[in-house]
Amino acid sequence: SPYNSTNQDILISQGLISKIAENIEADKETEVYTFENLYVSCGWFDSGVSFGEPGFEERETLSNGLEVAARSGFTKILLNSNTDPIPDSKSIIGHLIKMSRGLTTTLYPIGALTVESKGNQMASLYDMISGGAIAFGDFKRPIQKANLLKIALQYCQSFEGMVISHPINNELAGKGVMHEGITSTRIGLKGIPSMAESVQIARDLEILKYSGGKLHIPNISTEAGLDLIRKAKKQGLKVS
């Protein structure tokens, strides 16, 4: 922005910014608010939001969650596929979008990659895209079947869809509850080795290199995992 690191006045008319300048002369009908050390930015985007509705409304309703997002500066959010029912069809995706209409923050649903997020049968991705989904993934569940990931990446290229793959190898992670190391041994808790993440990421990136497409890997927690993604980006792979 040309206004970066500068002090400016901002004129807002009917909810929209109409002018930015160092000194704006306000007429008598204009309400003036003065703030010290106030920072202004473009609206933010959250790529992984969980609301309670539908299915867990006692935690938080969708309208309340979107209002909180708007008041926090988020103009767009990506809704995780952990509702009940799981959003694995066009009708459920459409229902989520319909519920969010008229609110300040725009909601983009993540559709489940597999039916009921069970990891077996690929869901109707094209139907969900036409219903308003923009990405597909089984919330916090890795894609254990390598061929399923390959097919999903290939199929999504026909409509610019993105696949989300949670970076954990369940067999290596086992029933671990924390990082495997001296501390986990000392306090007697089952640990998860770092390679449970890096092995899964390496596999997913090899499949992406073969299949093409767009892949998003969330919740990276290891240096090795970050290094693998950096190298893949340098090779031109569409991974985030």
Task: Give each language-model segment a name.
Residues 36-100:
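Metal-associated gating/positioning segment near the N- to mid-region
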Residues 122-240:
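Histidine/acidic residue-rich metal-binding segments in metalloenzymes
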